[in-house]
Amino acid sequence: MTVPGTFRKAVEAKDLSAITGSLDPGIEFHSPVMVKPYHGRDSVAALLGVLLEVFEDFHYTDELVSAGRPDAPAQALIFNARVMGKAVQGLDLLRFGDNGLVTGLTVMVRPLPAAMTLARAVGRT
């Protein structure tokens, strides 16, 4: 199984240890609700652990793999979930390094009221 497949399976299984293992030590995470990115495996894994708790009924609905730049592989995982009862649609954009680990993760969510609820929910944990 490829690392992209490993990351997806780990998220779907809510396996934080496996998620952490798929992250590069120097990963950069861009949150949909914070201006500054998070840096480093430990910080990003901690935040992803919170998201595993906050998202309800999380499931990926589609997967897109970049074919444009072999030197910078990327994958987009599209998901649906709920946060405090509000429906959320989102996208995890992953970038991979030469070692096959996730070096960049950008999460985008919509609609705005759900993104605001997500920010409140993450802030409570």
Indicate where each model-derived feature is located.
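C-terminal and inter-domain tail/linker signature
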Residues: 1-125
